[in-house]
Structure formats: structure tokens, C-alpha cells
Design a protein with these regions (language model features):
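Intrinsically disordered, low-complexity regions
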Residues: 3-175
Length: 175
């Protein structure tokens, strides 16, 4: 089977499981509660952290887009019937990642309601901070595609691009 290279940080996101976990909090001791609170203070109701990685930075960027759309619907239900190209530019790598995700989000929110099944980054220009990508997918439609969480905005909050052993990115989105 295909192993997806992004993880949903469910304990930090608003999902039925997270809400159920909140209700179970009263069973925790004070000590357990203290341990539980040792990750960045995300507001579970309004924020979600995307964490994606790959063998290359291009792949990490691709996976980050798919992680974002993974909150909006089950991307496994999407068929690659249409092709969409997305380009973006920034003034550094973080702003490039921000605008890249924002452009993909715009493809969904601006009348097209496009959801990709797969995204391929054609190139990242690290000198000019430009990116070109292509996505295969289709228009979002109920009941074919389950409705997940609405992604309202990309944020710069705690955004990271790490390129040590394996390239990985961390992005917080408003939901």
C-alpha cells in the first residue's frame, strides 16, 4: 500500500477524536495534565499544524499541500480528471512556502473548488524564490467527497523549513 508522508497531528486539531479527548480530561491527574500541555500552545478550535516531509524539499512541499487538503476531504476519494498549474513566488523560502500553500488554497476557495489527488512540484528556484507545480484532481462535490474541516488561512506562526537529514516543513493553518 501507499504510505502517506504526512501525519495528522490529531491531538492538536479539532476532530471528533480531539473533542472526545477533551471530554476525557477530567479523568487525568494534575501531573498528567501538566505533561499533556508541553507542546506549542495551538488553539485546538482554530488552528492545526501541518507537518510534511520528503526525500527532497520539493517532495516536502508537495506533501504539505496534500496534508492541507487532507483536512478538507479524504483525498483518496478524488479522481485525477483535471489538471491545474500553480505558481508562486516569495522573498525568501518561508514566504515562498506560504504563498505556495495560499495559491493552492485559493484554487479551492475561488469558485473552482479544486481538490488535488496528487501535487507535483516541477521546480523550486531558490535564488529567485519561485515555485511551479501541477496538480491532478477534480471539483469538490458532495456526496462524492466527504466534507472535512474548512481551512481558512495559512499562517506564518511557527513556520519552519528544515533541511538537515530529511527535508521537512511545519505550517500552522487557521481552520
Amino acid at each position: 500500500g501507499h504510505v502517506s508522508q504526512y501525519q495528522e497531528v490529531s491531538e492538536r486539531c479539532s476532530s471528533p477524536a480531539a473533542m472526545a479527548a477533551d471530554e476525557r480530561d477530567y479523568n487525568l491527574t494534575e501531573e498528567q495534565k501538566a505533561v499533556k500541555a508541553k507542546y506549542p500552545p495551538l488553539n485546538k478550535k482554530y488552528e492545526c499544524e501541518l507537518h510534511a516531509w520528503g526525500d527532497t524539499l520539493e517532495e516536502a512541499f508537495e506533501q504539505c499541500v496534500m496534508a492541507m487538503f487532507g483536512y478538507m476531504t479524504d483525498t483518496e476519494t478524488v479522481e485525477p480528471v483535471d489538471t491545474v498549474e500553480v505558481e508562486a513566488e516569495g522573498h525568501d523560502m518561508l514566504s515562498l512556502l506560504f504563498h505556495f500553500l495560499d495559491e493552492w488554497l485559493y484554487k479551492f476557495s475561488a469558485n473552482e473548488f479544486f481538490i488535488p489527488r496528487e501535487v507535483k512540484v516541477l521546480y523550486i528556484d531558490r535564488m529567485q524564490f519561485k515555485i511551479r507545480s501541477i496538480g491532478w484532481g477534480e471539483e469538490f462535490s458532495l456526496p462524492k467527497h466527504p466534507q472535512g474541516t474548512e481551512v481558512k488561512a495559512i499562517t506564518y506562526s511557527a513556520m519552519q523549513i528544515c533541511e538537515d537529514e530529511k527535508p521537512e516543513v511545519f505550517v500552522i493553518i487557521d481552520i
